[in-house]
C-alpha cells in the first residue's frame, strides 16, 4: 500500500521560497506547525482569509496553485491579492509559473559578492555594464521567487544597484544617472525590508546635492538615512560613516567647522564600539577611511599641519588593495604641500598618486591631482611642475581618463 504524497505543490513552493521545514513556514506565518502539516496533507483545508493572504504573499502563488481546492472551505476568491511591488522592479507572480528553487538566491548573491570585490580592481567602464546586467537578472528573478528566497534576492539586487550608482557617481562622474540608480536601489531595499541597506542608499543620495552645494537637500536626505539606521542593528562603523558622509557634504557646502564636529563624533562612535557587526557590503569604510575624510576636511579648513599629520597616518594604514583610496590620500597630501608653498613636495605626492591611478583608475583621485595642478599654476615654469605635466598629460593617463 503506497503512502499518500500529500500536498506536494505546497511543499515544493515552501522549499523554493526558502522555508526548508514546516516549522520555518509556521514561524513566518505566525501559526502552529500542526496547521502547516494539515495544509501539506492529502486533503488540505482552505486557510482562513488573513492567513491565506499571508501565505500567498510569502510563497508568491495563488491558493489553487498551492494545492488548495475551493470546495474544501469557504470561497475566498480564486486568488489572494498580493502587494504591489516598487516601481521599476518586477512584480510578484499571481500564479505558479517558472518558480525558481531556493538555491537561486545563493547563486545570485554569490555574483553580487564577486562584483563587490571586483570594484576595487576592475576598470569602472568594464564592471558597470556587468553590474547593470546582473541587476536586470535580479529584477527578473523577483518575479520568479517568493518568501525568504525573494527577500535575499531583493537585498542583493539593492546592493547591485548601489554598486552601479557608486560607479556612476564616483567613477563615471554622472550624478544624474547615479540619482536614478540610487532610487532603484532604494526600491529594492524596500522589497527586502532591509533598513540598513536603505540607510546606506539614502546617504549616497545625499552626495548628489551635497557635492553641488545644496546643503538643505543633502541634510534632508541625511535625516532620512539616520532614521533608517535607527530601525536596524546598525554597527559603529555604519553610524560613523553616516557622520563622514554628512561631514563631506558640509565641507563641500563651506562649513568645515560643522564637518570637523561630525568627524569627531564619528571617531567617538568607533572608539566606543558596539555590539553589532558591520554588514558585508560596508566595504567602502573603515577607521582609516574616516581619517582620510578628516584629513581632507582639515585641508579645506586650512589646518595644514594637522591635515599633513592625519593624511600621513591614513596613508601608512591603508592596505595594499586600497589603491583607489591611496590615490585620493596622496592627492590630498599634494594639496597640503601646494597650499603650504612646497611645490617640489606637492609634485612628488601628485606623481605617486598618478602611479596609483595607472594601476587602478579612480576619477575622484584624478580630480585631486588636477586640483593640485591648478594650485601650482604660479610655479608652472619649474622643472618639477613640467615633469608633473608630462605625466598628467601622457598618453597612458590621457587615454585612461577618456576611456574609463
Regions found by a protein language model. Give the residues of each.
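A short, Lys/Arg-rich alpha-helix, primarily the initiator
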Residues: 1-20, 24, 53, 64
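Alpha-helix N-cap/N′ positions at the starts of helices
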Residues: 2-9, 31, 110, 160, ...
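Residues in the recognition helix of alpha-helical DNA-binding motifs
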Residues: 13, 28, 39, 69
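DNA major-groove recognition helix of helix-turn-helix/homeodomain DNA-binding modules
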Residues: 30, 49-65
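Recognition helix of helix-turn-helix/homeodomain-like DNA-binding domains
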Residues: 30-47
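Compositionally biased, long intrinsically disordered regions
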Residues: 57, 64-110
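Conserved binding/catalytic microenvironments
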Residues: 99-105, 109-404
Amino acid at each position: 500500500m503506497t503512502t499518500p504524497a500529500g500536498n506536494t505543490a505546497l511543499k515544493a513552493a515552501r522549499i523554493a521560497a526558502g522555508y526548508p521545514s514546516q516549522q520555518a513556514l509556521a514561524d513566518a506565518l505566525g501559526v502552529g506547525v500542526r496547521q502547516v502539516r494539515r495544509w501539506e496533507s492529502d486533503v488540505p483545508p482552505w486557510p482562513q482569509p488573513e492567513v491565506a493572504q499571508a501565505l500567498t504573499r510569502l510563497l508568491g502563488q495563488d491558493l489553487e496553485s498551492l494545492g488548495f481546492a475551493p470546495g474544501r472551505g469557504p470561497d475566498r476568491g480564486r486568488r489572494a491579492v498580493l502587494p504591489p511591488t516598487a516601481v521599476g522592479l518586477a512584480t510578484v507572480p499571481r500564479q505558479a509559473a517558472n518558480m525558481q528553487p531556493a538555491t537561486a538566491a545563493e547563486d545570485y548573491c554569490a555574483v553580487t559578492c564577486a562584483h563587490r570585490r571586483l570594484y576595487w580592481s576592475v576598470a569602472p567602464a568594464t564592471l558597470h555594464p556587468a553590474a547593470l546586467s546582473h541587476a536586470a537578472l535580479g529584477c527578473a528573478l523577483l518575479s520568479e521567487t517568493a518568501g525568504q528566497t525573494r527577500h535575499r534576492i531583493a537585498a542583493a539586487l539593492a546592493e547591485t544597484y548601489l554598486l552601479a550608482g557608486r560607479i556612476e557617481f564616483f567613477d563615471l562622474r554622472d550624478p544624474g544617472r547615479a540619482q536614478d540608480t540610487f532610487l532603484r536601489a532604494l526600491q529594492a531595499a524596500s522589497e527586502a525590508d532591509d533598513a540598513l541597506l536603505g540607510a546606506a542608499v539614502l546617504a549616497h543620495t545625499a552626495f548628489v546635492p551635497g557635492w553641488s552645494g545644496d546643503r538643505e537637500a543633502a541634510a534632508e536626505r541625511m535625516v532620512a538615512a539616520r532614521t533608517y539606521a535607527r530601525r536596524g542593528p546598525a554597527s559603529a562603523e555604519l553610524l560613523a560613516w553616516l557622520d563622514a558622509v554628512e561631514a563631506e557634504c558640509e565641507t563641500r557646502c563651506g562649513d568645515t567647522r560643522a564637518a570637523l564636529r561630525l568627524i569627531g563624533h564619528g571617531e567617538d562612535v568607533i572608539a566606543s564600539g558596539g555590539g553589532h557587526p558591520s554588514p558585508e557590503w560596508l566595504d567602502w569604510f573603515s577607521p582609516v577611511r574616516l581619517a582620510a575624510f578628516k584629513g581632507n576636511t582639515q585641508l579645506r579648513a586650512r589646518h595644514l599641519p594637522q591635515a599633513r599629520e592625519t593624511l600621513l597616518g591614513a596613508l601608512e594604514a591603508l592596505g595594499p588593495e586600497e589603491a583607489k583610496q591611496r590615490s585620493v590620500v596622496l592627492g590630498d597630501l599634494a594639496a597640503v604641500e601646494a597650499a603650504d608653498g612646497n611645490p617640489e613636495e606637492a609634485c612628488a605626492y601628485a606623481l605617486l598618486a598618478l602611479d596609483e591611478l595607472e594601476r587602478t583608475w579612480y576619477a575622484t583621485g584624478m580630480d585631486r591631482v588636477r586640483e593640485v595642478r591648478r594650485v601650482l599654476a604660479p610655479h608652472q615654469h619649474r622643472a618639477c611642475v613640467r615633469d608633473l605635466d608630462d605625466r598628467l598629460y601622457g598618453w597612458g593617463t590621457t587615454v585612461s581618463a577618456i576611456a574609463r
